[in-house]
Structures are given as C-alpha cells and as structure tokens.
C-alpha cells in the first residue's frame, strides 16, 4: 500500500503541536531536534580535530552519541517548554564543543572553518530530509505519515538552526566567522562582546520586541530576518530536490 505523498513547498509546515502532547508529537519533534543538535556539535569537533586541535577529541566530544552533547536545559527543558506552550516551532541547543582556537593551524581561518562546520552540516541534513520526501510515497501507510512528519520537522529544524547560528553575534557560529574574516581593528571590539552574547540575544529577541509592543512598534527585526531567511532556504532546498 502506498503511503502519504511528500508535500509541495506551499504545504510545508512543521508539525503543529496539539493541546495535549502525545508520545507521537514527541517522537516527530524530539528525534529530528536531537539529531540536528548532535550532528551540529560533532561537526565542530571533527573539523577542529582535522585542523590541529585535539581538545574535543580528548574529551570524547567528537562523537555522534547524543548523550555526549546533551545540555539538560537546552536539549531537554527548553524544547519541552516550547512544546507545552504550543510554539509554532521547536528549538534547542547542546553543550558547546570545546575548541582551543590557538591550537588550530592558521588560527583565524581555522576558526572560520570550525564555525561553518555546524551550520553546513545542518544544511546537509536538511537537504537529505527534503530529498527523502520522494521515498515516503513508497512506504506502508501505517508508517508513512510518521516518517513524513519527522522529515518535515527535520527540514525546518535544521535550516532554522543553521540560519540562527549564522547571526554575527559571538558566541554564535556567525560571530566566530565574523571574528575570523573581519580586520583585527573590527574583530577585537566584536570579540569583547562574547561574554555578553547570550544576554544580547535575549535582549534583541525578547526584551526589545516586548518594549516596542508597549508603544505599538514592531521591533522584532531579528526574528523576522531569521524567519524570512529560513523560509527562503527551505524553498531553495525544495526546488533543488524536486519538491517545489
């Protein structure tokens, strides 16, 4: 029996979570999220090791074992909170892979390659998920929908993770790329922001939009950029894989 067909680009949406969270909902959200985060972090470690830094390798972090990368809050609590709050998308993070950038061959360019490894891996996973849509119609009906929902969420989660991480704010990957490519006169002031990077993100993603809403202003600019960029990349991947 033929199962569900792969979606056209116009119908592609992450699986919405209903009021009552079920094991099915968890299985189609948590599995692709853990895979996306695990491969993202492992990729940093693999590239760092290839470029001369053995820190992650010695600590056992160059691994595709999710248990090596799980952060209790970022990988478990935060996604669960988003699920329970019926967020339109699921997001999370893992423990950052430790990298000694001074040990890399060609330190600044090496930092760029290590940083790009995570988002590039997520885009590759998203491309594989989109390509796999074509296989769903050949699966038994009782498993096709589950596989399709996992693939749809894998596509969205991986692209979102890649796009968000490329924001040029340290310690995000985009911030590392900027530090490696900018002239030192610009890179040094940006590097000084790293200890406050997460606070800056919370400010521009949550506090600034909330403050703007009090005055009738839409200041949620970064979320709009991430959302629009994510949609564009998803559409591009669907075209590339013949799903448009």
Could you say what each language-model-derived stretch is?
Residues 2-244:
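Hydrophobic transmembrane alpha-helices and their immediate loop junctions
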């Amino acid at each position: 029996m033929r199962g569900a067909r792969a979606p056209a680009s116009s119908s592609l949406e992450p699986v919405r979570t209903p009021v009552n969270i079920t094991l099915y909902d968890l299985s189609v959200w948590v599995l692709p999220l853990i895979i996306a985060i695990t491969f993202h972090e492992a990729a940093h470690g693999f590239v760092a090791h290839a470029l001369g830094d053995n820190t992650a390798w010695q600590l056992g972090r160059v691994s595709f074992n999710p248990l090596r990368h799980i952060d209790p809050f970022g990988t478990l609590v935060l996604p669960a909170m988003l699920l329970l709050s019926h967020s339109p998308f699921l997001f999370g993070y893992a423990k950052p892979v430790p990298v000694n950038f001074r040990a890399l061959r060609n330190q600044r360019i090496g930092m760029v390659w290590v940083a790009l490894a995570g988002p590039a891996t997520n885009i590759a996973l998203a491309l594989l998920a989109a390509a796999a849509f074509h296989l769903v119609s050949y699966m038994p009906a009782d498993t096709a929908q589950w596989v399709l929902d996992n693939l749809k969420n894998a596509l969205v989660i991986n692209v979102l993770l890649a796009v968000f991480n490329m924001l040029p704010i340290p310690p995000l990957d985009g911030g590392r790329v900027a530090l490696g490519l900018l002239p030192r006169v610009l890179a040094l002031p940006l590097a000084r922001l790293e200890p406050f990077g997460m606070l800056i993100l919370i400010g521009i993603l949550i506090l600034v939009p909330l403050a703007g809403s009090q005055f009738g202003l839409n200041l949620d600019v970064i979320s709009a950029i991430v959302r629009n960029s994510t949609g564009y990349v998803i559409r591009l991947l669907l075209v590339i894989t013949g799903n448009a």
